[in-house]
A protein has these predicted regions:
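Charged interaction segments
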Residues: 26-27, 36-170
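Short, extreme N-terminal segment that most often corresponds to the first beta-strand
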Residues: 1-27
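Intrinsically disordered, low-complexity, mixed-charge
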Residues: 30-31
Length: 170
């Protein structure tokens, strides 16, 4: 059993080659293969409009449902979680060493009411800020209320129907 969370983690880049390099470095981690983490990883190429014209944004997106997301516990973080989180470290390293801009967004919703977590980071440059703005409109938490009552009627219709049933039973 254990506590489970739904999550979306996004790493966005200005160029396809940058996304490819990060993905390649990530998949070299033995934990990525051991836990088959690429199964939860999606790739997005989205054309977005800017003041300068059109730009492509390339994103690596983890989508996890009902995940045992333990970053810190008495026994330490889960290895799959550590591996997924290591992609942000790769982005930071590639930015520091090679100037590759990135933006990062982490969204998690836990089982309990109000257990919502958001984290963001970027390369803190013009392109990083652009990517952050892009992510802001592309990944967000939206809460809804769902109901599954059947045969809902207005109060007047319901009262009329109840009255008719009472008259039949008399």
């Amino acid at each position: 059993m254990g506590y489970r969370s739904d999550l979306v983690i996004v790493h966005s880049f200005m160029h396809k080659s940058h996304a490819r390099e990060i993905l390649t470095a990530f998949t070299l981690d033995k934990r990525c293969q051991e836990y088959d983490l690429t199964r939860h990883l999606k790739i997005s190429c989205d054309e977005t409009h800017t003041a300068d014209g059109k730009r492509d944004v390339y994103s690596l997106v983890f989508v996890g449902e009902q995940w045992k997301w333990y970053e810190d516990s008495a026994l330490g973080a889960y290895e799959d979680v550590k591996c997924i989180n290591s992609m942000l470290d790769l982005c930071k390293d590639f930015n520091k060493e090679r100037g590759i801009p990135y933006a990062y967004k982490f969204l998690r919703i836990g089982e309990e009411d109000g257990d919502v977590e958001r984290r963001e980071d970027s390369s803190q440059c013009k392109h990083g800020e652009f990517l952050e703005d892009y992510q802001e409109s592309s990944a967000y938490i939206h809460t809804t209320i769902e109901q599954d009552f059947r045969n809902l009627k207005s109060v007047s219709e319901g009262l009329t129907e109840l009255q008719e049933k009472e008259n039949v039973n008399e």
